[in-house]
C-alpha cells in the first residue's frame, strides 16, 4: 500500500468551505503519479522510454464525509493488477474518519493507439509488492 498526506487548501474549497470534488480527483491523480514515481516507473517516462502508458479508462468515487480547508487527509492507494490492466483503489481519511473511497482503472496500452499490452513483469512485480506490504 502506498500512502501520502494531502492538505486541503482554501483554493480547493467551494463557496461553502467544503473541498470541491474536482480538487479531490486532482489529489488522487497526483497520488497515482507519486506512486508510479516511487516504484521507479513515472507515468511521464513510460511513453518516452518504453512506448506504452497506463491511460485511465474508468473512474469512480464515493464521498462519505466533507473535507474542509486545513484538513490533513491521509490518502492510501492499493494496486490490483491483472495481465493488461491495473486498478488503483483509494481511501481518504481525515482525523481517522473515512472521507472518500474510489478507484481508477488503467489499461497498459501502446503509445499511438496500438491497443492493450501485457504489463511488463518488472512493473507488475512492483504493483504486487505494494499490495503485500
Question: What positions do the PLM features span?
Answer:
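Hydrophobic beta-strand-centered segment that forms part of the acyl-chain substrate-binding groove
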Residues: 35-74, 78-85, 101, 107
Amino acid at each position: 500500500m502506498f500512502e501520502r498526506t494531502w492538505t486541503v487548501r482554501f483554493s480547493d474549497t467551494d463557496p461553502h468551505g467544503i473541498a470541491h470534488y474536482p480538487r479531490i480527483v486532482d489529489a488522487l491523480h497526483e497520488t497515482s503519479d507519486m506512486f508510479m514515481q516511487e516504484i521507479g516507473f513515472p507515468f511521464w517516462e513510460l511513453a518516452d522510454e518504453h512506448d506504452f502508458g497506463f491511460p485511465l479508462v474508468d473512474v469512480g468515487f464515493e464521498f462519505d464525509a466533507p473535507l474542509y480547508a486545513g484538513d490533513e487527509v491521509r490518502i492510501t492507494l492499493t494496486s490490483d493488477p491483472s495481465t493488461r490492466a491495473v486498478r488503483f483503489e483509494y481511501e481518504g481519511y481525515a482525523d481517522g474518519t473515512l472521507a472518500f473511497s474510489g478507484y481508477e482503472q488503467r489499461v497498459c496500452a501502446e503509445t499511438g493507439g496500438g491497443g492493450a499490452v501485457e504489463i511488463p513483469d518488472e512493473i507488475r512485480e512492483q504493483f504486487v509488492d505494494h499490495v503485500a506490504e
